């Protein structure tokens, strides 16, 4: 991938960009094998990769510069702003949106937030695109609601320029910290969720629900999990840290009982909407802490699927699973280091199958799917 921003030394986010993709994949596979070196692995499946550029469905832009000449991108460590509208990780469909947003910021009088001076209103622009219909969700992250009326007044112009904007919100983030979003979300459109579709499974994206940023690889990850589950004698499963339900909705069959648990209510609302559309009545999604939910149960299903954040599932949940001993555990991880640590805490299990998914090209990060079987 050629990147003018990298070549000019203006952005170093893609640290592996100079390595060809096959080399990147080999290095990631070697890292994963090294992390799992203490465990016998029955089957290493071939790594899965996707496009090397234009693959991201989401842009998180720090807004800086002036209200007349805003910059959308990032701040360097010394506070110097960098415009990243030309980043080749974004699809071509993002360029016209960025181009229209800059004059809109001036029209609406949304003064960019100045970190050094702690002044200004507009902190971030968050843009998400649906692969299924090209619809977009746009979120303005503001310090307060001071400019809300001005923004509402100017909005029809932006909607006329960009009819693909299906969901538009304002998020209020009042704290002087590098936190992407606050708790308050104000909808400026009637539509509140973006429709997405992976492998004929309807998914929904709401403002405060996590969704994978590489749809081409994420859809293969979900399809692989579905294929693995279909090969197992499973009638009842848990989907812990389930997010918008991607794994559970792919794996469920009409006669399977499935419980999906996720702490974010917005994500659970998405999962319930998808389950209703699919007519899957034996699926239950609840907004709870996954560890607290699991450890309070007196019995476990045949399969527990976990998809935790980078920190892993942690010792309390590992201890519970070791004691309760479900027949199968599928572990989806965005941090193989913590996954390996967790597997060490599950001594009664052997690794049947491992597959690497290159969700984050040009970086050292990757996703991994592991099937653990009770010995």
UniProtKB/Swiss-Prot annotation:
Binding site for S-adenosyl-L-methionine: 212, 241, 262, 307
UniProt cross-references to Pfam families, sorted A to Z: tRNA_U5-meth_tr
Record-level GO BP terms: rRNA base methylation
Keyword Iron attached: yes
CDD domains: AdoMet_MTases (cd02440)
Active site residues per record: 334
GO molecular function: 4 iron, 4 sulfur cluster binding; iron ion binding; rRNA (uridine-C5-)-methyltransferase activity
NCBIfam families named among the record's database cross-references: meth_trns_rumB
Family of this protein: Belongs to the class I-like SAM-binding methyltransferase superfamily. RNA M5U methyltransferase family. RlmC subfamily.
Name of this chain's protein: 23S rRNA (uracil(747)-C(5))-methyltransferase RlmC
Species of origin: Escherichia coli O81 (strain ED1a)
């Amino acid at each position: 991938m050629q990147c003018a921003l990298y070549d000019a030394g203006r952005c170093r986010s893609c640290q592996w960009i100079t390595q060809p993709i096959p080399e990147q994949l080999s290095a990631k596979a070697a890292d994963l094998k090294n992390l799992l070196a203490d465990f016998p692995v029955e089957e290493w499946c071939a790594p899965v990769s996707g496009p090397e550029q234009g693959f991201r469905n989401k842009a998180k832009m720090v807004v800086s510069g002036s209200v007349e000449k805003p910059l959308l991108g990032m701040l360097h460590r010394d506070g110097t702003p960098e415009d990243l509208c030309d980043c080749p990780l974004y699809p071509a469909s993002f360029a016209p949106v960025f181009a229209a947003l800059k004059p809109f910021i001036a029209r609406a009088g949304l003064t960019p937030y100045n970190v050094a001076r702690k002044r200004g209103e507009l902190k971030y622009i968050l843009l998400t695109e649906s692969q299924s219909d090209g619809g977009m969700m746009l979120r303005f992250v503001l310090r307060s609601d001071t400019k809300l009326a001005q923004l509402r007044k100017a909005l029809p112009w932006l909607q006329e320029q960009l009819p693909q904007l299906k969901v538009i919100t304002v998020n209020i983030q009042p704290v002087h910290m590098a936190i992407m979003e606050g708790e308050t979300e104000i909808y400026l459109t009637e539509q509140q969720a973006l429709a997405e579709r992976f492998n004929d499974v309807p998914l929904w994206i709401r403002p405060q629900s996590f969704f994978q940023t590489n749809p081409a690889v994420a859809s293969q990850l979900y399809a692989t999990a579905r294929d693995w589950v279909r090969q197992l004698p499973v009638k009842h499963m848990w989907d812990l840290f389930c997010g918008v339900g991607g794994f559970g909705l792919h794996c469920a069959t009409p006669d399977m009982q499935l419980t999906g648990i996720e702490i974010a209510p917005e994500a659970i609302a998405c999962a319930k909407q998808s389950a209703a559309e699919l007519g899957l009545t034996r699926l239950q999604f609840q907004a709870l802490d996954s560890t607290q939910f699991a450890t309070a149960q007196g019995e476990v299903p045949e399969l527990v699927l976990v998809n935790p954040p980078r920190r892993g599932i942690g010792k309390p949940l590992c201890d519970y699973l070791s004691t309760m001993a479900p027949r199968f555990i599928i572990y989806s991880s965005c941090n193989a280091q913590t996954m390996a640590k967790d597997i060490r805490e599950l001594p009664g299990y052997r690794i049947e199958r491992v597959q690497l998914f290159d969700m984050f090209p040009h970086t050292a990060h990757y996703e991994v799917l592991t099937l653990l079987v009770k010995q």
